[in-house]
Every structure is written in structure tokens, then in C-alpha cells.
Regions:
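Bacterial N-terminal signal peptides that target proteins for export
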Residues: 1-8
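C-terminal motif of bacterial Sec signal peptides marking the signal peptidase cleavage site
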Residues: 15-18
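Periplasmic peptidoglycan-binding/tethering modules of Gram-negative envelope proteins
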Residues: 20-97, 171-174
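Extracytoplasmic/secreted proteins, especially bacterial periplasmic and envelope-associated proteins
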Residues: 78-85, 111, 119, 123, ...
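A non-catalytic structural micro-motif
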Residues: 94-103, 118-149, 162-174
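Short beta-alpha junctions and helix-cap segments that line functional grooves
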Residues: 150-154
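A generic structural micro-feature
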Residues: 156-160
């Protein structure tokens, strides 16, 4: 690389770095609002895992996934605890919909694992509907073995990939 090219690259990098303004969000990253004001609830930041109306609460406090045994779509007792929490959250936060993703480990054919992921997602959906969540607020999709959490060849690792994940979205229809 020629010296002039190196200098031009350095100048461009410095120019881009100068465009950033870390102070524009205030000391706490809250857009200068200090994390208080409208939408704040007694010191709990909106969107935090401590806010029971936040999607972060369901993801980090209740749990967003249910694990399954090999070749199974039957919900375990541990899974029922998670799904009961999800159902309660969805019943109390009607502004959200959910997509339930079914997943499988890498063992088996692609077609088999897509079908297994669909059965897992449907099992979760049916349970949430049985707890009172409107069916119209739930969608399912199966990824089979196409989106593993980890790529591996041990049972402990495979177990993490046999799951159904509840992904929340704001309901923009109403």
C-alpha cells in the first residue's frame, strides 16, 4: 500500500471518529433524559428485566424457551413452569403478539427435524391457548436444525438445541 493511500485511510478513519458524539445520550445513555420522566416507573427503567411489562422481563426473568427430550414434543414439568409464566405475561400485556419458534438438534434429516420443530412449536402454542392466550396472537414457525444455539457433537450440547423459543413483538394492528 502506498504512503498516500495509508494517509488517506487514516484521515478518513479520523474523520469518521470525529462524527461520533458520546455526550449526546447523557451520562447514562438515556438521550439526556437521565432515565426519568414520562414512561418511567418508580426508578425501574422501561425495557428492563425488572419491569414486569417489558419484553426483557419475559426473556430474562420468566424465560423465553422450553427444552425438549430427544425426538419429543411433550412439554416437561420445567417447561410448564416457564409456559405458565409466559401465559400470565401475555394475558397481562395484550399489546404483544408472539411467534413460537420450534427447533431441533442436528441429528436426523432436515425434513424430520422441520416436522419435529413444528410439533414442538404447536405444543407450546396449544398450551398457551389452553391458558387463555388468544390464538390470533400466536404464530408458529419451525426452523428444524437450521438455527442451532451451538454446533456440537455431545448430548449436553444437543439438548440446548431441542427447544421452542417464544419471540415477542408489539402488536401494530390496533
Amino acid at each position: 500500500m502506498k504512503l498516500t493511500s495509508k494517509i488517506a485511510l487514516l484521515v478518513a478513519g479520523l474523520a469518521l471518529a470525529a462524527c461520533t458524539d458520546p455526550g449526546r445520550f447523557g451520562a447514562d445513555g438515556a438521550g439526556g433524559a437521565g432515565g426519568t420522566g414520562a414512561g418511567s416507573s418508580g426508578g425501574i427503567a422501561a425495557g428492563s428485566p425488572s419491569d414486569p411489562t417489558s419484553p426483557a422481563y419475559i426473556n430474562q426473568t420468566i424465560g423465553d424457551r422450553v427444552l425438549f427430550a430427544v425426538d419429543q414434543s411433550t412439554i416437561s414439568q420445567e417447561g410448564l413452569v416457564v409456559l405458565n409464566g409466559q401465559a400470565d405475561w401475555l394475558l397481562n400485556n395484550t399489546d404483544y403478539t408472539a411467534v413460537i419458534e420450534g427447533h431441533a438438534d442436528e441429528q436426523g434429516t432436515r425434513e424430520y427435524n422441520v416436522a419435529l420443530g413444528a410439533r414442538r412449536a404447536n405444543a407450546v402454542r396449544e398450551y398457551l391457548v389452553s391458558r387463555g392466550v388468544a390464538d390470533s396472537r400466536l404464530q408458529t414457525v419451525s426452523f428444524g436444525k437450521e438455527r442451532p444455539i451451538e454446533i456440537c457433537s455431545s448430548e449436553a450440547c444437543y439438548a440446548k438445541n431441542r427447544r421452542a423459543v417464544t419471540v415477542l413483538a408489539a402488536d401494530l394492528s390496533g
